[in-house]
């Protein structure tokens, strides 16, 4: 039982109005659930969708040179630190080299190590897509914001896929 449920449970057990208190307990637990969910790594499908959506939005920004949509999907602290123009300058080499890795949409990411939530509540996701001849490597960090994971850090690079 969570600390919130224990505290609310104590309140309910001492109360003279069990129905009203039960409603309060249900309401508190309903609002606590998203916060609890944000402290866990998403399901395999959810994590794959998060990684692909992040990297494909980043790829679109690089291909088009327009970082506005990518910027809008960042966590607030990241958005405040990096304007769309600064993002474009930061990833200038991707834009200049015309790096396009939209092929990742057809592949499952390989996580190394497994995704985890650190002590600060950040979702850390590192790995690669087994694309050939060039492999896409990523190191992403997300924070909970408005009930969903929002990007706070991104490192992406491409390299030649290892030959068997």
Predicted features along the sequence, with ranges:
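A broad structural signal for short, well-ordered beta-strand segments within beta-sheet-rich domains
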Residues: 1, 98-101, 148-151
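N-terminal secretory signal peptides that target proteins for export/translocation
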Residues: 1-18
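Bacterial N-terminal signal peptides
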Residues: 20-32
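Short solvent-exposed beta->alpha transition segments
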Residues: 41-53, 68-122
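Short helix-adjacent coil turns
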Residues: 58, 62-69
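Exposed beta-sheet edge and beta->alpha loop/turn motif
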Residues: 109-164
């Amino acid at each position: 039982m969570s600390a919130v449920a224990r505290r609310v449970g104590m309140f309910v057990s001492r109360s003279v109005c069990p129905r009203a208190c039960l409603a309060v307990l249900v309401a508190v637990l309903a609002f606590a659930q998203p916060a609890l969910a944000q402290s866990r790594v998403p399901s395999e499908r959810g994590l794959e969708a998060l990684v692909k959506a992040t990297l494909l939005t980043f790829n679109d920004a690089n291909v088009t040179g327009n970082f506005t949509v990518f910027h809008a999907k960042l966590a607030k602290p990241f958005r405040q630190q990096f304007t769309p123009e600064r993002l474009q300058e930061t990833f200038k080499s991707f834009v200049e080299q015309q790096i396009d890795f939209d092929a990742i949409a057809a592949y499952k990411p390989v996580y190394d190590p497994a995704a985890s939530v650190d002590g600060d509540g950040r979702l850390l996701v590192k790995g690669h897509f087994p694309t050939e001849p060039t492999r896409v490597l990523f190191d992403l960090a997300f924070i909970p914001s408005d009930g969903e994971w929002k990007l706070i850090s991104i490192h992406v690079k491409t390299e030649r896929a290892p030959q068997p």
